[in-house]
């Protein structure tokens, strides 16, 4: 039931940065729909469905 002691060791700067970058890949700004919207590639109907 006790966590291993290694769980209490702080991440290195590089590990911390990598964990943040890995987490960021899941953000909505990278979703294909959002990318198409940002690039102006959505049809009027697609954009209206998103707004509704």
UniProtKB/Swiss-Prot annotation:
GO biological processes: pyrroloquinoline quinone biosynthetic process; sulfur compound metabolic process
EC numbers for this chain: 1.3.3.11
Catalytic activity from the UniProt record: 6-(2-amino-2-carboxyethyl)-7,8-dioxo-1,2,3,4,7,8-hexahydroquinoline-2,4-dicarboxylate + 3 O2 = pyrroloquinoline quinone + 2 H2O2 + 2 H2O + H(+)
Pfam assignment, any one: TENA_THI-4
Transmembrane segments: none
Function: Ring cyclization and eight-electron oxidation of 3a-(2-amino-2-carboxyethyl)-4,5-dioxo-4,5,6,7,8,9-hexahydroquinoline-7,9-dicarboxylic-acid to PQQ.
Protein name, UniProt field: Pyrroloquinoline-quinone synthase
